[in-house]
From Swiss-Prot:
InterPro entries on file: 6-PGluconate_DH-like_C_sf (IPR008927), 6PGD_dom2 (IPR013328), ApbA (IPR003710), Ketopantoate_reductase (IPR050838), KPA_reductase (IPR013752), KPR_N (IPR013332), NAD(P)-bd_dom_sf (IPR036291)
Superkingdom of source: Bacteria
Keyword annotations: Cytoplasm, NADP, Oxidoreductase, Pantothenate biosynthesis
Catalytic activities: (R)-pantoate + NADP(+) = 2-dehydropantoate + NADPH + H(+)
Binding positions (NADP(+)): G7, C8, G9, A10, L11, G12, N98, A122, E256
GO biological process: pantothenate biosynthetic process
Annotated catalytic residues: K176
Name by which UniProt lists this protein: 2-dehydropantoate 2-reductase
Protein source organism: Escherichia coli O157:H7
Family per record: Belongs to the ketopantoate reductase family.
Length: 303
């Protein structure tokens, strides 16, 4: 397949590496246009992939079979809209990012839209991307009109396993959102690795109760206890990890809070549900952000 990967950060480089190794024709797409992108990745087994790949070639984009978007949630909408007119109208766009809310911003996109969520973990260490842990990627249609692209899951399964297709991806996205609503803001506020959160079961339960109430009103059956058990499982499995939000805070970057707890707040408001704990966490992270964005270092640029 011919694939353009939009966003060449940790997750983007992970996919570029895996696609390249499987013989797919790939290019990166960067915010600052340049003819190549450097991919420098250390795999979970210690092997190294270090290549310069094509980037920002509009002819390549115009003949791509898939646009894989691995940007931060707040960058997605503007970036995808800027490329949509060059991309064939039949080429699916697969979004893989933390949080929810980008689909609502892309309702008028003509191309088929797919949403994904992944438990693969990768982080930056200087100029190198470390593939910290293998995981599973869930993908499915973002809107009712987006149809069956399960063949893509089969192809991507051979690239970076595991990949699972869901006709109803929304339920999976909400489960991941519950995890993100707990782990991301708490680690960002307390400046700690994920594993430290084990010591705060009451706080975690409080957040899960609020998230479960919203999920139920969204039409997906769950319980606060189920969400809590799942969150604790993820905390244990990723105990050593530094969450993406804490990485953003430490490097004075704009976080994805608007698409995590912020998205939950918007849906809660729509259903008339009070979510005081999530509101408090949202405001605390926004306050941290504003401390450095006020002096201009972490201002959200266009993607």
């Amino acid at each position: 397949m011919k694939i353009t990967v939009l966003g060449c950060g940790a997750l983007g480089q992970l996919w570029l590496t895996a696609l390249c190794k499987q013989g797919h024709e790939v290019q990166g797409w960067l915010r600052v246009p340049q003819p190549y992108c450097s991919v420098n990745l250390v795999e979970t087994d210690g092997s190294i992939f270090n290549e310069s790949l094509t980037a920002n070639d509009p002819d390549f984009l115009a003949t791509s079979d898939l646009l894989l978007v691995t940007l931060k949630a707040w960058q997605v909408s503007d970036a995808v809209k800027s490329l949509a007119s060059t991309l064939p109208v039949t080429t699916p766009i697969l979004l893989i990012h933390n949080g929810m809310g980008t689909i609502e911003e892309l309702q008028n996109i003509q191309q088929p839209l797919l949403m994904g969520t992944t438990t693969h973990a990768a982080c930056r260490d200087g100029n190198v991307i470390i593939h910290v842990a293998n995981g599973i990627t869930h993908i499915g249609p973002a809107r009712q009109q987006d149809g069956d692209y399960s063949y893509l899951a089969d192809i991507l399964q051979t690239v970076l396993p595991d990949v699972a297709w869901h006709n109803n991806i929304r339920a999976e996205l909400w489960r991941k959102l519950a995890v993100n609503c707990v782990i991301n803001p708490l680690t960002a506020i307390w400046n700690c690795p994920n594993g430290e959160l084990r010591h705060h079961p009451q706080e975690i339960m409080q957040i899960c109760e609020e998230v479960a109430a919203v999920i139920e009103r969204e039409g997906h059956h769950t319980s606060a206890e189920d969400l809590r058990d799942y969150v604790m499982q993820v905390i244990d499995a990723t105990a050593e990890n530094i969450s993406s939000m804490l990485q953003d805070i430490r490097t004075l970057r704009h976080t994805e809070i608007d698409y995590i707890n912020g998205f939950l707040l918007r849906r809660a408001r729509a259903h008339g549900i009070a979510v005081p704990e999530n509101t408090r966490l949202f405001e605390m992270v926004k306050r941290k952000e504003s401390e450095y964005e006020r002096i201009g270092t972490g201002l959200p640029r266009p993607w």
